[in-house]
Amino acid sequence: TPLFTKEKHMATIEVSGKNYETDEEGYLVNLAEWNEDVGTYLAQTESVEMTEQHWEVVNFLRDYYNEFQIAPAVRVLTKAIGKKLGADKGTSQYLYDLFPYGPAKQACKIAGLPKPTGCV
């Protein structure tokens, strides 16, 4: 048995009259419950005003996660975005302009995905 356990504290957010469970950092617990209204709400909690460019990245992350069951590290995300959305968008500067507190971490939160681990 472990000497100590770190208990995850849950919270609830209400979006459009429906409750959604989040972890202590505001990441959605059940990614299947995500929708654009939830994404918009989570973006507001991160002080991100969603534009078409933000949604491109968020939808890309959701597709990537559905295919690989993991969120990409920033380097992988940058390369993949460049291939799919164009070289001008495949730069870390572009992604940091959209998500100033970290493209992987912040965009994953808005996309309803688990917090990325490792090198983000």
Question: What is each stretch, according to the model?
Answer:
Residues 22, 76, 82-120:
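Helix-rich interaction surfaces within compact, conserved domain-sized segments
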Residues 37-68, 74, 78-83:
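Metallocofactor- and cofactor-centric catalytic cores in central/energy metabolism, strongly enriched
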Residues 10-17, 34, 75, 79-82:
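Short, charge-rich amphipathic segments
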Residues 1-9:
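Short, Lys/Arg-enriched N-terminal segments with co-localized hydrophobic residues
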Residues 27-32, 67-70, 81-82, 93-94:
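A short, ordered amphipathic alpha-helix with a cationic face
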Residues 14-49:
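N-terminal first-folded block
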